[in-house]
Amino acid sequence: MDTVSATLSAAALLAIPEDKPERLFKGGPDEVKKAYRTLAMRWHPDRNPYPGARAVFQHIQRMLGKAEEKIASGDWPCRGVLRLAAVDGRTYDIGYLRRHRFELGAMAVANTVVAFEIDRAHADLVHRAERAIRGFRFADDRMRGQIGRHLPGFPFAGAFRTGTGNAYVIVMRKRPDLLLLRDVLDHFGGRLDPRHVAWVLSSLLNLCCYFHFAGITHNAFSPDTCFMSPSDHSVAVLGGWWYAAASGERMVAAPANTLAWAPHDLLCTRRAGIRTDLELVRAVGRELLGDISGARLARESAAAQAMIEWLRLPAFDDPIDEYRTWRTQVLHDSFGARRFAELPLTQSDICD
């Protein structure tokens, strides 16, 4: 197991939810068993004189049980091989690094691709995603080069219906340096350094400016749809395109997270608008700082006051204005002069 997990304190171990064993155990089934043996030897009450050792040991046992349940059901998020049989008889093997369930199906994150399995009941949303991604437009090649790398490419690396007919599979290309925000957030125990949150939000706000130009809305920004590159401080939005719509178009679906944080009038009009994406940028920022509601951020000094205030204020409907205020006022008041904050993190750090 990784050194960090092996040396976690009793309080840190007990703080890990029982239903999130992947925050403690990394790798495949063999690595999980090895990690458990290491932790069990350290925390067994017959070997450890710490008064709370029994509670820690029992907590570790319960997390092992949850890990074994997830492995047996195919829901274990760490390394494995996903075998998919297509309706044409061909078989595809995807060696994934992380795997996650989401509201429409499952997602497997590999080194150079990410595969989405969408339940058959949501076929119409798959077609909407394909139309949105195929329809990206750019003012010129310079814009295409600057913005295109933060969006899914088309044609997809793969797209097919499974042989059982129960799911559609979309395989998107992914740069090896891109890490799912959810995995990064879990790796750091549910809270990121505000300096890194800042550049994630800068990248998302920049994308909102492009969406405004292109007349589209994404409607599903979250740590489960966005990927970050620690090496070049950028974000790519590869997931969630099932909910994309043209500005002003009537939305046919939205995930629960969007309904929770979108402008109130969205529930009444159901019309897509850029303000929804701008509100979700703020929600992403709050979640990365440890509290998506924003209620505890100031009390816990999760970031500078200027940043916290901006994250808790309602968004306006002009992304260019929002981006300008963020860059010239909020970032300056929060961090002073611009400096590159290194984040030495790779996929192997998360998976091994």
Regions found by a protein language model. Give the residues of each.
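Activation segment signature within eukaryotic-like protein kinase domains
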Residues: 200-201
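Conserved N-terminal boundary motif of the eukaryotic protein kinase catalytic domain
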Residues: 78-99
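ATP-binding glycine-rich loop module of kinase domains
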Residues: 95-149
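Conserved C-terminal segment of Hanks-type protein kinase catalytic domains
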Residues: 317-334, 342
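Catalytic-loop of the protein kinase fold
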Residues: 208-230
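C-lobe/activation-segment region of protein kinase-like
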Residues: 235-317, 336, 340-351
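Conserved structural core of kinase catalytic domains
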Residues: 152-195
